[in-house]
Amino acid sequence: MAVFTPPSGNSNSTDHTHTQDDHDKDDNDIKKFYIRPSLGLKLWGPLVPAPDNLPGLYTLITIQSAVGFFALWRLRRLYKLPPPRRIATGTHSDLSFGELPSEMIVNGKTKIKKDIADFPTLNRFSTTHGDIVLAPPPIIPRQSRFVSVRKLLWGLFGSLLLSQSLLELTRLNFLKYDPWCDEMKSVRDKKFFNNIVKYYHEGIDPTKIKVKDAMNGTPLSTNIPEVKQSVALARAQVEAQNPIIKWFGPLEYKPMSFNEYLNRMEFHLDMFEFFQNKRNIRENSIELINSISHNPQSSSTGLEGLSESKKLHLQNVEKRLHFLASSGDSISAPVKRSSTTLSRGVILPHDTKGPQDIDLDTIRSLYDPWMTLALETSLSIKFIPTTMPSHTKTPTSTDQPLPGPTPKALTNEKTH
C-alpha cells in the first residue's frame, strides 16, 4: 500500500519552471548567430560582413577576385605546357618536355627528316648520311587524365569566384535601393538607442566609473540625470565602435529572407516606374502648354472649338435661369424669416435674400472653424516613465508599490 503526498507549492513551482524555461529560450535565441546575407560572398560562410559594411565587403570581393585570377592563371600555364616526348640518351630513354627544333619540320607538317648521324645509338663517326622520315606530330597532343582534370578544376574554380565577385559588385554599385542595407542601418540605430536606454536604467557603478567636471575637474555625483545620460551615451558609442559589431552588426540580428528581398525590390521598381510615368506625363503636358502659348496660330482651330462649346453652354444656362425665373412668379413664395440660422450656427442678417448678399470675409472672420475647434478643445497630457519587466523576479504580496503616478494620471479631456 502506498500513500501519495502532493508536493508543497505545486502551482508556484510549475509557474516558476515555465518562466525559467521561457527565459532560457530567449537567451538561446539571443545567442544564436545568423549568417549575413549576400549574393556573391556566400562561399565565405559566417565571415560575410554586414550589408552596410562597405569596406568589409570590398575587402572580401578583392580577395575572392584575386584567388579567381590566380586559378585562371594556373589554367593558362597548363595550356601553355608542351606535350611530353621521349629523348633517347645512351641505352635508355627519358620522358621530357620540349619543342621539336624548327629545322626538323619539312614542308610544313607533312614529314620530318632526321640525319642518321644525329641519333646517339648509331655510329657517330660514320660518314654515311641519310634521311629518316618520321610521322608528323598530332594537331591535338595526347595528355594524361590528371592534366585534364586539373584544367577542368582550375577553370571551374576561377570562373565561379569571378562570377560571384561580379554579382556582388553589381549589387553594391548598380542597385540604387538595397533592402538588406537599409534593414541593417535601421537595426544598428535601434540597437544604439536601446543600449542608451538600457545603460541609463542600469545606472553608474561608482567603483568602476568616475565622472569629473570638464571645467574644473571636480568629481560629480553619479545620480544626476544629466550625468547618467552622458555616461549611457558614451557606453553605447563604445559598444557601437566594437570591431566585431562594426563588421557583423548586432549579433542577434536576423536578416530577411531572399524571397522578401525580391518582393521589396519588385515593389521598389514598380513604384519607381509609376513615378517615372507620372513625371513624364507632367513634362509632356508642360511642353504642350508651352507649345500652345508660343504658337497660337497652330492651335487656333482648337481654341475656336472650345469657345463655341462655351458659348453654347452659356446659352443653355441662360435659358434655364429664365425658365426658373418665369415659373417662380406663378408659385407662391414661402414666408421668409427675419433671420436665417444655418446648421453650423452661422446667423445671417434678415435682409439676406441670396448668396450674392453674403459678405464672405466678414462671415469667415466671425465664424472661423479652426478657431472654434481650438476654443472648444482642451487637452491635458501627462507622460509616465516606463519600466523594464523582470523575467526572474515574481511579484509577491509583500512587495511595496513603486512610487509614481497612477494610470489615472494620464488624462485626455475634451471640454466644450
From Swiss-Prot:
Transmembrane segments: 57-73, 152-169
Keywords, ordered alphabetically: Membrane, Mitochondrion, Mitochondrion inner membrane, Transmembrane, Transmembrane helix
Subcellular location: Mitochondrion inner membrane
Highest taxon above the source species: Eukaryota
Keyword Nucleotidyltransferase: no
Transcription recorded as keyword: no
Bias-annotated ranges (Polar residues): 390-400
Membrane topology qualifier: Multi-pass membrane protein
Region (Disordered): 1-28, 390-416
One CC-aspect GO term: mitochondrial inner membrane
Mitochondrial intermembrane-facing ranges: 1-56, 170-416
Regions of this protein lying in the Mitochondrial matrix compartment: 74-151
Ranges of Basic and acidic residues composition bias in the record: 15-28
Assembly and binders: Component of the mitochondrial inner membrane i-AAA protease complex composed of at least MRG1 and YME1. Interacts directly with YME1.
Described function: Component of the mitochondrial inner membrane i-AAA protease complex required for mitochondrial inner membrane protein turnover. Required for growth of cells lacking the mitochondrial genome.
Similarity-based family: Belongs to the MGR1 family.
Name this protein carries in UniProt: Mitochondrial inner membrane i-AAA protease complex subunit MGR1
Source organism: Saccharomyces cerevisiae (strain YJM789)
